[in-house]
């Protein structure tokens, strides 16, 4: 894929992300004003401390923050890397795709969806599960398949990442009767999915660390990448003010550090 075509894909992705943000926000606000938002009342808070106590609106804020993050970062990628050959941009867009899938959680509190065993709820469960699978897969691919010898297969590798995540998200069962505090629908083989994700996250950080050491490139880049992983998982799981705030800060800081160092790397190469 040429740089010009990549930039077009990036621009198209940015527009889609912007539209999804507008639709998600508008639909939620409409249902909130209409009194159609079912705020969970049976969630048992694990802490009595105000910042750590369960807060439904922190969950909603986290989902919206993820959506805003996708729009902002896709625009930054478009403007910052438009003249570079950074293969990482493709895989980062796939990672952002997983976050787009994750924003479907915002529809779960809408009355008529959360209070029924509808196909809509099942599809939302499939999307959130796909997000949980695609995030680690895309980040691992970002570190493992960005070398020169894999550059010709970048598009195919990105498509494979998405297809694998979607296939298993549809294949694995979801339990719409159980919805977590973070509005995530329960799914089968949860421990296996978490273990798989953890292995890929660790492998991706180690791969990037080794590659940066080999290329004599700053490990600050690796630290930023690790912060992206930590921040994303905190923000996804956030059900308190502290979780929301820390997730936003760590994810944002990690993204800035990683992308700045990555841009410096390609400026040096080009």
Regions found by a protein language model. Name each.
Residues 58-67, 123-136, 187-201, 243-258:
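Alpha-helical transmembrane segments of polytopic membrane proteins
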Residues 17-35, 195-270:
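C-terminal transmembrane-bundle signature of multipass membrane proteins
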Residues 108-118, 171-184, 231-242:
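Juxtamembrane "helix-exit" motif on the non-cytosolic side of transmembrane helices
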Residues 71-76, 137-147, 169-179, 191-219, ...:
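Alpha-helical transmembrane segments in multipass membrane proteins, preferentially the mid-helix core
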Residues 68-93, 99-158:
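Internal transmembrane alpha-helix with an interfacial aromatic "cap," most often the third helix
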Residues 91-98, 158-166, 218-229:
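Central hydrophobic cores of alpha-helical transmembrane segments
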Residues 8-18, 144-172:
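The cytoplasmic-loop to transmembrane-helix boundary for the fourth helix
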Residues 6-17, 26-29, 45-67:
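Hydrophobic transmembrane alpha-helical segments in integral membrane proteins
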């Amino acid at each position: 894929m040429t740089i010009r075509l990549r930039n077009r894909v990036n621009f198209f992705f940015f527009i889609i992300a912007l539209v999804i943000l507008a639709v998600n926000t508008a639909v939620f606000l409409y249902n909130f004003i209409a009194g159609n938002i079912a705020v969970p009342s049976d969630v048992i808070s694990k802490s009595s401390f105000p910042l750590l106590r369960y807060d439904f609106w922190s969950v909603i804020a986290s989902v919206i923050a993820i959506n805003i993050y996708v729009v902002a970062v896709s625009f930054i990628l478009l403007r910052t890397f438009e003249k570079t050959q950074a293969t990482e941009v493709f895989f980062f867009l796939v990672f952002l795709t997983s976050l787009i899938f994750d924003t479907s959680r915002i529809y779960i509190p809408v009355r008529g969806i959360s209070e029924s065993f509808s196909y809509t709820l099942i599809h939302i469960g499939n999307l959130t599960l796909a997000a949980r699978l695609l995030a680690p897969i895309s980040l691992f691919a970002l570190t493992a398949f960005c070398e020169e010898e894999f550059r010709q297969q970048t598009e195919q590798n990105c498509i494979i990442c998405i297809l694998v995540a979607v296939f298993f998200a549809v294949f694995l069962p979801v339990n719409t009767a159980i919805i977590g505090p973070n509005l995530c629908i329960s799914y089968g083989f949860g421990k296996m999915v978490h273990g798989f994700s953890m292995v890929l996250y660790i492998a991706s950080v180690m791969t990037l660390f080794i590659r940066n050491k080999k290329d004599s490139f700053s490990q600050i880049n690796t630290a930023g990448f690790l912060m992206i992983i930590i921040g994303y998982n905190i923000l996804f799981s956030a059900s308190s003010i502290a979780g929301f705030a820390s997730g936003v800060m760590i994810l944002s800081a990690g993204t800035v550090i990683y992308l700045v160092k990555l841009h410096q790397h390609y400026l040096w190469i080009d």
